[in-house]
A protein has these predicted regions:
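Active-site phosphate/pyrophosphate-binding segments
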Residues: 2-40, 135-253, 263, 327-344
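Peripheral docking tails and interdomain loops at the edges
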Residues: 302-344
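Glycine-rich phosphate-binding loops that contact phosphosugars or nucleotide phosphates
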Residues: 36-184, 210, 245, 253, ...
Length: 344
């Protein structure tokens, strides 16, 4: 029996992701062909909140796998300052679960008017963002009842992954086992974290990632703030050592998220610095060496580093949910938040 919409939608994700991985692959390849005909020289991604973290994930994918320079737009350039940058050779991707935030819609519409090819990734095919775009990649995960983004966030990660792999001419079969990987990762989080909290609500939390784990770290920190009212902040493992490590001390909890791969040594360096400052650590990873060094570890399963963010995010959502529930907080009613946020 589930106790909240957030829990229900976390549990629903393995099946939804498996369906999206299979069902959206042909559309991703069709969109990649349409994009190829325009020969974009660079990509601009625009989003807010959780979707902005999915956009950062997209930046890593686009630059690493597709060889395209990718940047994140500042929506106020279009929506407040009335700027019109030269985007004639760009692919502009708007990411929004609702597709209704005016600043994201204005950015995409302005870029389209300026000659860019535009694409919307959204859970609402009839939304203003979808209507403002040349191309659309729908998430099709059904209405999201949880105020804090759960299934739409991991679906955005998968949608971006499918699109970029198709743009790069790569095989999409790596996602074939995504549903079972997500299910195994969620089960691992449930075994390790159910009934757990991150300790004293007054103590700070740092969430650390690198590479594909970095946007997941930002997202987990946001979830801990949203549903747990935590003083949580996300950092790159590299940036952590450029100053923020000074604020880490005994009583601080550090959550490290990342997959086995080229960033592992950087994450281990960050974890060593965290321990040297007297903080306790929780590691979410498929890297046994990184997990071995943690105070507590949640092993996850992923088919390669570029897909790992989905399993990492799913385990992180369960952590945020459990931290809120064990302290008597209602994850479906975080104060001051609304499901659809409209900013200019």
């Amino acid at each position: 029996m589930t106790r909240s919409w957030m829990e229900s939608e976390i549990r629903s994700q393995p099946a939804l992701l498996a369906r999206l991985a299979e069902g959206a692959a042909p559309l991703a390849q069709e969109l990649a062909r349409a994009i190829s005909r325009r020969h974009p020289r660079f990509v601009v991604l625009t989003a807010r909140g959780s979707s902005d973290h999915a956009a950062i994930y997209g930046k890593y994918l686009l630059e690493t796998d597709a060889g395209l320079v990718a940047s994140l737009a500042a929506p106020s350039v279009y929506s407040i300052y009335g700027g019109r940058p030269d985007v004639r050779d760009a692919l502009v991707i708007g990411i929004s679960q609702s597709g209704q935030s005016p600043d994201i819609v204005t950015t995409v519409a302005g870029a389209r008017a300026g000659g860019a090819l535009t694409l919307a990734i959204t859970n609402d095919e009839s939304s203003p963002l979808a209507q403002a775009s040349d191309l659309r990649l729908p998430l099709q995960v059904g209405p999201e009842r949880s105020v804090a983004a759960t299934k739409t966030f991991t679906a955005e990660l998968l949608a971006v992954w499918l699109l970029v792999q198709a743009m790069a001419g790569k095989d999409l079969d790596s996602a074939a086992n995504l549903g079972s990987d997500a299910e195994a990762s969620l089960a691992s989080a449930q075994r390790t974290l159910s009934g757990s909290s991150l300790g004293d609500p007054a103590s700070p939390i740092v969430v650390v990632g690198r590479g594909y784990g970095y946007p997941v770290a930002l997202e987990l920190a946001l979830k801990l703030r949203e549903v747990g009212r935590r003083n949580a902040h996300g950092f790159s493992a590299a940036d952590l050592l450029h100053g923020p490590i000074a604020a880490v001390q005994a009583g601080t909890t550090a959550v490290v998220v990342g997959a086995a791969g080229p960033t592992s040594s950087s994450l281990r360096d960050g974890l060593a610095a965290i321990h040297a400052h007297g903080a306790r650590s929780l590691v979410i990873s498929n890297d046994p060496e990184l997990a071995w060094e943690a105070s507590l570890a949640v092993p996850v399963r992923a088919a390669g580093e570029s897909l790992s963010g989905i399993s990492l995010a799913l385990a992180g959502q369960w952590l945020a949910l459990q931290d809120a529930l064990t302290r008597g907080l209602d994850p479906d009613r975080p104060p001051g938040l609304a499901k659809i946020t409209r900013t200019l």
